[in-house]
Amino acid sequence: MSGHSKWHNIQKTKGAADAKRSAAFTKIAKEIIVAVKQGGSGDPANNSRLATVIAKAKANNMPNDNIKRTIDKALGSGNTDNYESVTYEGYGPGGVAVIVEALTDNRQRTAPEVRHYFDKFGKGMGAQGCVSWSFDRKGVIIIDNEDGDYDEDTVMMDALEAGAADFAADGPVFEITTDPDAFNDVIAALEAKGYTFVSADISLVPQTYVKLTSEEDIKNMEKLLDMLDDNEDVQNTYHNWETED
């Protein structure tokens, strides 16, 4: 099976998360709290949203103790953390489509900050729906086979038998995509067979990609993504910039 791998689009984000692990854990903890409160349960078997966030936490090497403490905190009667999910859409340099998902306790703080990033480094923030139509929501699981521990055909068969929608190999990197509703089942089936992931989340995958040729556009796009990544309210940033291999 084939398809354009999004690995090149997340490599930079993954590296930034490794360099800023504490900040990454803080953002994931916020997602866990929201998942527990909205799902009404601290048991991932009874809370599919929590199960999805836990898969993301494990892929980011968040210790199990941290995950458990965060769940316990969310279940505690004294917890007053209240976050609202908000989504912003806009355009980066060269017309790159960008979607920003945030969890915030103050829209009046977050919206102007995100708008400033778009105005300074991109083409501005747009109305809801201006770019989201060009993305599909999918489960995306990334396996790194740089050490050659996995056989490509075996991984593909295991993934498809677990219910994955597609499989793509990009050098030593395997990308598995799923329907959102099948994501948790596929994760559980692959984990049961001993697979580990460098990334696992329900993501927005672009239908088409944009290449930037101007050095200025490339630098501004990198700055835009860095600013969004550094914002404590921003949880996820999706875009259709096709970086060079």
Where are these regions (language model features)?
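N-terminal cationic and glycine-rich segments that engage phosphates or anionic surfaces
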Residues: M1-G126, V131-I142, H239-E242
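Positively charged, low-complexity, intrinsically disordered RNA-binding extensions
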Residues: V140-D245
